[in-house]
């Protein structure tokens, strides 16, 4: 019997003693993996060039309808580079020489020989294409994004929630708004609360996957598309345990643990965003600064000036999925257009090579009906 697909956000707590329309938009993701602000011009076909700026560590996804180019001041002066649609790029500056590199994504991806850096990032775990030479006031890159996809959600707490309804509704709506600030900028998606509710959770269930099953059985997402449940059910264990989970991309239910006072609000935001990322097709990432890293609750989010971001490869995946959802009435990965499924196959195959011990990418790849399964 096939086991149900469940993806989890895992947290480590240390104890004190121990097939779509013929013409459609594509997506190009550009990330700044340097420490300094970069200003560049993005041109989509014969449209007017947009002057954009990315702070160090930021990224953006850009709508691409025709052949795109990017202009910037590189190591050898002004550069003009053509960009491939539905691809991800990184500004990098090895030896102080600024360049733009495409992240090589392929179903036949091979691991890079260099590897095991102290702080892994996407661009040094995947092979990258070589840079080729080249052709107003800067605006934040997010201003170039249009056509936000709105996903209606129902937010629920269980009967173990201690706060008043007014308090928990305010707390969770603020958290979702903080998540939307990132989702809207990085992949043109926002989650809109259309209903609040409560459910009675079984105090005898201590296994998280069983709790997810119970949540699915007791709660209907209507009138929303997605039900997000916050449970205050459990004692605080030591070691690694599941802090959130869902059964896979576009699944109707997400369950998140809410109880532990050891978890700060930025860490709670990360867990929720991690699971919403799974809903949109994001998988676990080798990038140590990505919200899709496999282990959360690692205290990284407690660092001053910490910024929650997705890695560029997962932003590309989520943008591809959201574009199909925006263009068509899509409710499962099997309903995505064939070109989108094939590109997602490239992404998940490359992620699987980068993280051979993590099964998430392979599990997501197997949900793609347009891709032959081995």
Model-derived regions, located:
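Short pre-active-site segment immediately N-terminal to the catalytic Zn-binding motif
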Residues: 253-273
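Catalytic Zn2+-binding segment of zinc metalloproteases
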Residues: 276-291
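Post-HExxH zinc-binding segment in Zn-dependent metallohydrolases
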Residues: 291-322
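Catalytic zinc-binding patch centered on the HExxH motif and its immediate surroundings
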Residues: 233-251
